């Protein structure tokens, strides 16, 4: 009997430790706002429908990757520096916050985002052309279906010959160099030499240090 109780205590302690470790590993953006996720929010519904984990304000997969973020009614004027931790999110709710109008660069890198819920007076990042559907309600605005603008007419021509267009978030594009090319306009061929880069950086730093040392010595002698 004592053995069973001892085993049960160990199991409970192990579960407690695992729970603490999971809590400690929770991304900071998930606890930006006190309390848990709103039960009737679209993020909570998505999390339940896909059998994902709900922790604080986040919906996570088994690896701890953020798939949903519910920061509605958090008195946020700006999503903050940790918002980038949610770049893997598929759905984000920011309604009922006094956000600033321009959020274009806030969502740079959010290439997986498919549903974004904003205050009614805040436009969808990238404008209506960056989304399949933009729906306005009395208290919120919903941006759905992020478009890949690289597929739009004329967009691929913005990249050089050895580069290709890639989405970088709602309404945002970037040029990615093809394999074997790098540098300005992807014109340099071959692998990027880290040894050469750090060699040049080290030489430049050494030269500046010697120059500053010489200047200080001359000032010291003059005084």
From Swiss-Prot:
Membrane topology (Extracellular): 26-193
Residue numbers on the Cytoplasmic membrane side: 215-223
Transmembrane segments annotated in the record for this chain: 194-214
UniProt keyword annotations, A-Z: Cell membrane, Differentiation, Disulfide bond, EGF-like domain, Lysosome, Membrane, Nucleus, Signal, Transmembrane, Transmembrane helix
Signal peptide: 1-25
Cystine connections: 150-165, 159-175, 177-186
Signal among keywords: yes
Residue stretches making up the EGF-like domain: 146-187
Membrane topology designation: Single-pass membrane protein; Multi-pass membrane protein
GO biological process, one term: regulation of gene expression
Keyword check for Cell inner membrane: no
Compartment list: Nucleus envelope; Cell membrane; Lysosome membrane
Cross-referenced InterPro entries: ATRAID, EGF-like_dom
GO molecular-function term, one example from the UniProt record: xenobiotic transmembrane transporter activity
Cellular component, GO, one term: lysosomal membrane
Cited function: Promotes osteoblast cell differentiation and terminal mineralization. Plays a role in inducing the cell cycle arrest via inhibiting CCND1 expression in all-trans-retinoic acid (ATRA) signal pathway. In osteoclasts, forms a transporter complex with ATRAID for nitrogen-containing-bisphophonates (N-BPs) required for releasing N-BP molecules that have trafficked to lysosomes through fluid-phase endocytosis into the cytosol.
Quaternary structure annotation from Swiss-Prot or TrEMBL: Interacts with NELL1; the interaction promotes osteoblastic differentiation and mineralization. Interacts with SLC37A3; the interaction is direct and both proteins are mutually dependent for their stability.
Protein name (record): All-trans retinoic acid-induced differentiation factor
Originating species: Mus musculus
Lineage start: Eukaryota, Metazoa, Chordata, Craniata, Vertebrata
